[in-house]
Amino acid sequence: MGTPNDQAVLQAILNPNTPFGDVVGLDLEETEEGDEDGVFPQAQLEQSKALELQGVRAAEAGDLHTALERFGKAISLLPERASAYNNRAQARRLQGDVAGALEDLERAVTLSGGRGRAARQSFVQRGLLARFQGRDDDARRDFEQAARLGSSFARRQLVLLNPYAALCNRMLADMMGQLSAPSNGR
C-alpha cells in the first residue's frame, strides 16, 4: 500500500491535475462527526435530525421556503446544535440572503467550537461566500480551517487561491501531457 507520502507522489504522477497531497482515502483519517451530538437528549436529537433531513430534501427539490421552515424548527428544538445553522445557511444563500447565511455560519462555527463536520462545512461555505465577495484573505483563512478538519475541497480551493501553486500544477500537467502524448513522426 505504501506510506501516505508514497500515495501522494503516485497521485501527483498519475493525476497531475489534482492538487499535490490530495489523496483519495486519506481524508478518512479525520475523526468523523465530532459534533458532540451526545450532549443532547436523544429524542430531541432524533427529531432535530429528522427535521434537518426534511429541510435538505426540500432544498434539493427547490422548495426553499419549506427548507427554511424545517431548519428553523430544528434550531428551535436544539438551539445549541451547529448542524441546523449550517444547513439553514445554505438555504439562505440559495435564496440570496447572504447576510443571513453569514450570520448562521458564524453561529455554527461558534457552537461547534471549530471542530467536527458542521464546523468543516461551515468554514467551506463561509470561505466560498468570502471568495465570491472578493475577500480572498478571509476565504483563505476559512479554507485553511476546513482543510485542517479534513476537507479535500478546501485544499483544492487553497491551491486555486495560491497563484504559484496553480502555476506549478499547470506546468506539471503540461509536462505530463507532453510525456504521455505520442510523438509525431516516430
UniProtKB/Swiss-Prot annotation:
Amino-acid biosynthesis listed as a keyword: no
Family: Belongs to the TTC36 family.
UniProt TPR repeat ranges: 48-81, 83-115, 120-153
Organism lineage: Eukaryota, Metazoa, Chordata, Craniata, Vertebrata
InterPro entries assigned to the protein according to its UniProt record, in alphabetical order: TPR-like_helical_dom_sf (IPR011990), TPR_rpt (IPR019734), TTC36 (IPR038906)
Name recorded for this polypeptide: Tetratricopeptide repeat protein 36
Keywords: Phosphoprotein, Repeat, TPR repeat
GO biological process: central nervous system neuron development; memory; negative regulation of proteasomal ubiquitin-dependent protein catabolic process; negative regulation of protein polyubiquitination; tyrosine metabolic process; visual learning
Modified residues (Phosphoserine): S152
Keyword hit for Phosphoprotein: yes
